[in-house]
Amino acid sequence: MKVSVLITLAVLGVMFVWTSAAELEERGSDQRDSPAWLKSMERIFQSEERECRKMFGGCSVDSDCCAHLGCKPTLKYCAWDGTFGK
């Protein structure tokens, strides 16, 4: 009983690896092109100018954050600075 379970699991593992390799071979060009596509998307988003960082946005100084938000020094994110008003 134990041997048949182990053999079944081994066969399923081999089939999984075989089908994964065949799938990667079919769409291999897509995999190679995807890093370039991701880099171009990153450039698009970095080129946008932002007025201020909203809540939980990354920052380096308080002036990066929107009104009533301050840059937390430990984790470098914008959080409420405890002030109210317009």
Swiss-Prot record:
Residues making up the propeptide: 22-50
Subcellular location: Secreted
SUPFAM superfamilies xref list: omega toxin-like
Signal peptide: 1-21
InterPro entries, A to Z: Huwentoxin-1 (IPR011696)
Ribosomal protein as UniProt keyword: no
Family: Belongs to the neurotoxin 10 (Hwtx-1) family. 28 (Jztx-11) subfamily.
Function: This toxin acts as a voltage-dependent gating-modifier. It inhibits the sodium conductance (IC(50)=124 nM) and slows the fast inactivation (EC(50)=1180 nM) of Nav1.5/SCN5A. It significantly shifts the activation to more depolarized voltages and decreases the deactivation of Nav1.5 currents upon extreme depolarization, but only slightly affects voltage-dependence of steady-state inactivation. In addition, this toxin causes an approximately five-fold decrease in the rate of recovery from inactivation and an approximately 1.9-fold reduction in the closed-state inactivation rate.
Remarks, miscellaneous: Negative results: does not show effect on Kv1.1/KCNA1, Kv1.2/KCNA2, Kv1.3/KCNA3, Kv1.4/KCNA4, Kv3.1/KCNC1 (all expressed in oocytes), voltage-gated sodium channels (Nav1) (from DRG neurons), and in a range of voltage-gated calcium channels (expressed in rat DRG neurons). In addition, does not show significant toxic symptoms when injected into mice and into cockroaches.
Name by which UniProt lists this protein: Kappa-theraphotoxin-Cg1a 5
Species of the source: Chilobrachys guangxiensis
Upper classification of the organism: Eukaryota, Metazoa, Ecdysozoa, Arthropoda, Chelicerata
